[in-house]
Amino acid sequence: MHLIFGGYAQGRLSYALKTYHKNRADVFDCATQPLSEWNGQTILYHLEALVSQSLQQNKAPLTLLQETVPNWQDCILITQEVGCGLVPISAEDRKWREAVGRMNAQLAAQAETVERIFCGLSMQLRKCPFQSRPPDAAANTGRQNKNPAEHPIEYY
């Protein structure tokens, strides 16, 4: 499972489509479709909308999450970052914001990769093992065992 989060209009979906070589047919938009219509699409977009739907039905969002996450292990989950803006005035909006924050934290704890998108750029918070360089990659760069003091230019 891969988690991508970021603020409004920061390029989360565009980044996911480009980086993971997907197209619009691979996207399930949780803001416009009920979760019951999910048909195995690889990208689940606007995951924060599931929190709104759960709260409107008087269901615990984290319970829904626990029930559905096992089905999403091979998916890319895209959600909105909350908590960096103003605290909402209404109690209902504050409840939604807290629930989305808790959902994001639980998803991040379970995801193989976690990326924050800001201005269309990715900040990797957790990197998937298959994305890292193989152990012998350092041998191919000619950089192993170099002392930074002896080669200061290469380290800037």
Where are these regions (language model features)?
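Conserved nucleotide-sensing/catalytic segment adjacent to the nucleotide-binding pocket
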Residues: 25-27, 35-77
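Generic hydrophobic/packing signal
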Residues: 5, 20, 45-48, 86
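A short acidic, often aromatic-flanked loop/helix-cap motif at beta-alpha or helix-coil junctions
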Residues: 33-37, 122-124
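A short secondary-structure junction signal
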Residues: 15, 55-56, 128
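Short, intrinsically disordered, mixed-charge
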Residues: 21-22, 56, 105
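Short, solvent-exposed loop/turn segments at secondary-structure junctions
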Residues: 10, 49-50, 83, 122
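Glycine-rich P-loop/Walker A and Walker A-like loops and their local beta1-loop-alpha1 context
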Residues: 1-32
